[in-house]
């Protein structure tokens, strides 16, 4: 997208959500939905539209795990890193994913199909270990189960 179109999207989102500090997170969330990540230019445009500092926008965007500030793969895998998931085998699940996708945590596959990230709590502690693939939760993971899940995404 070029800057003019991006700026129009920011204006449209500000019209929808408002131009107050409280509108910042909903606007950033919607930008991620539309563009899959927040560019530096997006954050500057939002700051101008809401009349707040770019540093405030950047600080907010980088604080929240789900507000990506760099391009990600088509499928973003977020593995929960809470103590509940860790105690239930998160490290084994992570190793399995890294082995299958041939990437390390924080990386994206060369074909840009998958990104592998950790997230703080994703809300499934009672069914740990858990992960999200984009917005789809997968729980009570085992190496076998995660292998099966990834095979389905690889086929897509």
Task: For each feature predicted by the language model, list its residue ranges.
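Signature of N-terminal electron-transfer/Fe-S-associated modules in redox systems
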Residues: 1-156
């Amino acid at each position: 997208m070029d800057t003019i179109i991006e700026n129009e999207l920011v204006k449209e989102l500000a019209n929808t959500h408002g131009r107050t500090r409280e509108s910042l997170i909903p606007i950033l969330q919607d930008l991620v939905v539309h563009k899959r990540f927040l560019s530096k230019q997006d954050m500057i445009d939002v700051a101008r539209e809401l009349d707040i500092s770019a540093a405030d926008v950047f600080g907010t965007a980088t604080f929240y795990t789900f507000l990506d500030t760099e391009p990600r793969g088509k499928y973003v895998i977020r593995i929960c890193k809470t103590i509940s998931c860790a105690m239930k085998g998160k490290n084994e699940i992570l190793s399995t994913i890294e082995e299958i996708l041939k990437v390390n945590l924080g990386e994206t596959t060369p074909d840009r199909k998958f990104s592998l990230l950790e997230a703080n709590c994703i809300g499934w502690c009672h069914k740990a270990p858990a992960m999200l693939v984009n917005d789809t939760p997968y729980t009570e993971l085992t190496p076998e189960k995660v292998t099966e899940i990834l095979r389905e995404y690889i086929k897509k």
